[in-house]
């Protein structure tokens, strides 16, 4: 970085000392731009060393045109790269210099670079917009905008200058919106009206800058919108759009130009229904529908076309009739069902929602509509077919969702009707107003014969036959399209009847739940028994196939052909493991137990309902193992079927084991006490070994009545020296316990002096673990027979001897 900063200093010196060489200065300026584009810190460094000020002075004082152009372009590029540089250049004197610069006679390229510099300073900058107005720079730009409009046959540089001026004006009035500058710029609307008539295929390059300026100036400004309409600009824009839309299906460039004009039209009529209703005579809706169905339309531009259609249909009923007569409903609904863009879906629903008054236009107002343009029965038939398509698509989407992730769906089996709530906020009437809607997804739709005309009476009959076909039974679009004339009268009655049905359904659901719980208490689960029995089928090929293909029994009788398509699938056995080839059925039972414990003792998540029933189900995995399992279940008054079966198996296992009896004979004072103790210890060891052999033999018997509930103990690895030292230490501890049991008949243990190593172990242990005597005893290899009390007393004596100044060698015998 330091080397780059040195290069910037050298380039700045080159600019200062090469005043007579414009080529060298131009190359130095372009090199500065390329360096500063690498890192924003270089722009800040150049500003600190005075490079920005020098380049600006060079743009004013240089006598070479190419140096002025390059200097202005360098300033614009640096301001675009760094915000602090832009704010440093935003001074009123600089804007006044720009005004003088634009009014002078200069080459078109230099003037274009100056306008580009000005557009960078006002873009996304409230301070720059204000300075452009106070310094009368906007007036200079408007004069240049009028004078530089390219007539046919002029040079390409003239067109580029006019496009740059339009961009600078757009930045001064919007982003952020500046109403004062908008009111100043709308004075050029009368000159724009004839320009709109020249926007056609031969001069398609005029559409983008001209429409951008109009859209930015009238956006969210009712005063500018009304003035644009008063000078005839809206009519001229609509005529241009109608003329271009007729050619949109033949050329992609014309389709792009039509999209640009459509966006401008939407900005001119947004939030103003009166302006939208004035366009009904021009019949813009059919042209927009042709544009929407054009194969040349970019999918990214569909949103603007649909929004403009929604603004027009929301303005008046006549344009809704135009939408219906031109076949707009199938196009909009097809777009709604096939697109994956959420914003486009909202816009399509907004268009359909604005057609809620279409029934009125089809009813009393039919006399004012040409019968050749609007076939009522044909449109109803078309709408019915579209409704069937929507519901078929909903079925397919629902099946895909269930197949993709059935566990993430809500548990709706307890309810008779599955309804999905849609919380998306939709535009209604205008961009600022919003509406919410609910819809219920149906599993079946009673198909109507294609030859039968679908009228409002037929739809009313369907509503009477289907108690759920109310406003909650259909989507907001379907409700608005298929409301009959008597729908409002029966709405309250249907809501009242629905509430009564919901109360009765809730009571029946509660009674069914109580009955099911009573049945579950009295009937054992056959599912666990089948799983345990299937473990013995591993040697049978048929049993192996059965184990691979089996699934857990379902709860209740469910009709797979029922109308409720959005229902939970039957629970299946996931991630099924192939049967092990081990001959030890006890280890298989242990693996099954661990698997079921992991399954039932998972912490409840947000997407699954809490179905814990007993202490075995409630305990977490770190609180429960195969040894504490029986104690936990015995403390619970009620066990589920699964844990009750496991507890019975454990009881059978414990009853089959031989009772371990340890006889403790009273000690008497006798000469041969030690000899009898040794004999007793020998007999106890023999009995213990015999019991182990019997248990090992019993564990290898293939019996269905006895199962091992604890995993087989694996031999410890003794390869590392730490493990070996720990094993030796445990062996020493065991021998010390045997020694204590052998000497338990006497009153005192044999006295053993403390070695130097033991004292060292004790000192290190206290430093490391404090007064945790048990930890110290098990951590270090003390002499067999030492206890935690011995360690505590010895440390106390050591501290006492140390305080009295006694040598620790003497304290060994304390």
Swiss-Prot record:
Entry's Gene Ontology cellular component terms: chromosome, telomeric region; nuclear inner membrane
Cited SUPFAM superfamilies: ARM repeat, Homeodomain-like
Subcellular compartments: Chromosome, Telomere; Nucleus inner membrane
InterPro entries, A to Z: ARM-like, ARM-type_fold, Homeodomain-like_sf, SANT/Myb, TERB1
Alphabetic keyword roster: Chromosome, Coiled coil, Meiosis, Membrane, Nucleus, Phosphoprotein, Repeat, Telomere
Coiled-coil annotated spans: 488-512
Intervals holding ARM repeats: 93-136, 327-368
SMART domains, per the entry: SANT
Biased composition (Basic residues): 689-699
Domain (Myb-like): residue spans on this chain: 746-799
The keyword Membrane is annotated on this UniProt entry: yes
Signal peptide extent: none
Family (UniProt): Belongs to the TERB1 family.
Function: Meiosis-specific telomere-associated protein involved in meiotic telomere attachment to the nucleus inner membrane, a crucial step for homologous pairing and synapsis. Component of the MAJIN-TERB1-TERB2 complex, which promotes telomere cap exchange by mediating attachment of telomeric DNA to the inner nuclear membrane and replacement of the protective cap of telomeric chromosomes: in early meiosis, the MAJIN-TERB1-TERB2 complex associates with telomeric DNA and the shelterin/telosome complex.
Name of this chain's protein: Telomere repeats-binding bouquet formation protein 1
Native source species: Danio rerio (Zebrafish)
Higher taxonomy: Eukaryota, Metazoa, Chordata, Craniata, Vertebrata
């Amino acid at each position: 970085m330091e080397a780059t900063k040195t290069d910037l200093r050298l380039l700045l010196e080159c600019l200062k000392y090469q005043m007579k060489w414009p080529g060298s200065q131009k190359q130095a300026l372009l090199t500065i731009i390329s360096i500063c584009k690498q890192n924003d810190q270089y722009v800040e460094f150049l500003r600190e060393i005075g490079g920005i000020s020098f380049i600006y002075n060079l743009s004013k004082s240089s006598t070479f045109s190419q140096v002025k152009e390059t200097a202005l372009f360098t300033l614009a590029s640096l301001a675009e790269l760094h915000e602090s540089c832009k704010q440093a250049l935003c001074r009123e004197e600089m804007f006044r210099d720009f005004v003088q610069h634009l009014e002078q006679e200069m080459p078109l390229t230099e003037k274009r670079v100056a306008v580009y510099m000005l557009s960078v300073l006002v873009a996304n900058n409230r301070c720059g917009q204000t300075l452009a107005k106070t310094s009368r720079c906007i007036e200079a730009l408007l004069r240049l905008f009028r004078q530089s409009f390219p007539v046919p046959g002029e040079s390409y540089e003239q067109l580029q200058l006019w496009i740059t001026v339009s961009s600078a004006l757009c930045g001064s009035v919007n982003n952020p919106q500046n109403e004062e500058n908008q009111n100043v710029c709308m004075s050029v609307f009368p000159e724009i009206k004839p320009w709109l008539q020249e926007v056609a295929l031969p001069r398609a390059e005029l559409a983008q800058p001209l429409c951008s300026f109009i859209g930015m100036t009238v956006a969210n400004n009712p005063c500018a919108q009304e003035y644009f309409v008063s000078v005839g600009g809206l009519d001229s824009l609509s005529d241009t759009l109608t003329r271009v839309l007729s050619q949109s299906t033949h050329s992609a460039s014309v389709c792009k130009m039509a999209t640009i004009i459509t966006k401008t039209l939407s900005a001119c009529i947004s939030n103003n229904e009166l302006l939208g209703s004035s366009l009904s005579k021009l019949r813009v809706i059919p042209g927009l529908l042709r544009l929407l169905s054009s194969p040349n339309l970019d999918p990214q531009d569909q949103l603007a076309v649909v929004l403009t259609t929604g603004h027009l249909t929301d303005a008046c009923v006549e344009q809704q009739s135009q939408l219906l007569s031109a076949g707009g409903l199938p196009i909009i609904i097809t777009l709604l069902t096939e697109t994956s863009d959420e914003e486009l879906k909202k816009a399509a629903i907004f268009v359909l929602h604005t057609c809620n008054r279409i029934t009125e236009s089809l009813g009393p107002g039919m006399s004012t509509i040409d019968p050749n343009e609007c076939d009522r029965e044909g449109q109803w038939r078309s709408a019915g077919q579209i409704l069937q398509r929507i519901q078929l698509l909903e079925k397919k989407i629902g099946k895909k969702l269930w197949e993709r992730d059935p566990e993430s769906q809500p548990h709706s089996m307890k309810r008779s009707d599955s309804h999905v709530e849609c919380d998306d906020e939709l535009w209604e009437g205008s961009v600022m107003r919003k509406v919410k809607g609910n819809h219920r997804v149906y599993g079946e739709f009673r198909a109507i014969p294609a030859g039968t005309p679908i009228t409002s009476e037929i739809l009313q009959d369907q509503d009477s036959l289907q108690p759920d076909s109310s406003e909650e039974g259909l989507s907001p679009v379907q409700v608005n399209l298929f409301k009959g004339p008597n729908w409002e009268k029966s709405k309250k009655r249907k809501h009242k009847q629905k509430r009564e049905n919901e109360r009765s359904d809730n009571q029946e659901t509660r009674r069914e739940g109580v009955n099911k719980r009573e049945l579950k208490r009295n009937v054992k689960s056959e599912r666990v028994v089948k799983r345990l029995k299937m473990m013995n089928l591993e040697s049978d090929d048929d049993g192996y196939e059965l184990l691979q293909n089996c699934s857990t029994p379902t709860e209740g009788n469910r009709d797979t052909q029922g109308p409720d398509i959005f229902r939970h699938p039957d629970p299946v056995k996931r991630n099924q493991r192939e049967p092990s080839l081990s001959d030890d059925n006890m280890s298989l039972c242990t693996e099954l137990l661990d698997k079921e414990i992991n399954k039932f003792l998972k912490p409840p998540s947000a997407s699954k309902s809490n179905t814990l029933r007993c202490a075995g189900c409630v305990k977490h995995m770190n609180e429960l193992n195969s040894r504490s399992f029986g104690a936990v279940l015995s403390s619970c008054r009620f066990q589920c079927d699964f844990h009750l079966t496991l507890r019975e198996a454990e009881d059978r296992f414990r009853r089959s084991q031989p009772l371990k009896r340890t006889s403790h004979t009273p000690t008497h004072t006798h000469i041969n006490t030690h000899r009898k103790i040794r004999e007793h210890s020998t007999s106890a060891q023999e009995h213990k070994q015999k019991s182990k052999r019997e248990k090992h033999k019993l564990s290898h018997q293939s019996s269905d009545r006895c199962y091992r509930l604890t995993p087989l103990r694996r031999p410890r690895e003794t390869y590392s020296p730490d493990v070996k030292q720990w094993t030796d230490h445990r062996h020493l501890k065991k021998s010390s316990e045997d020694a204590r049991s052998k000497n338990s008949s006497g009153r005192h243990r044999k006295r053993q002096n403390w070695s130097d190593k033991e004292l060292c172990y004790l000192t290190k242990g206290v430093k490391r673990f404090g007064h945790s005597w048990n930890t110290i005893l098990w951590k270090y290899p003390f002499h067999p027979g030492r206890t935690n009390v011995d360690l505590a007393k010895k440390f106390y004596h050591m501290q006492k001897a140390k305080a009295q100044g006694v040598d620790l060698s003497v304290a060994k015998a304390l």
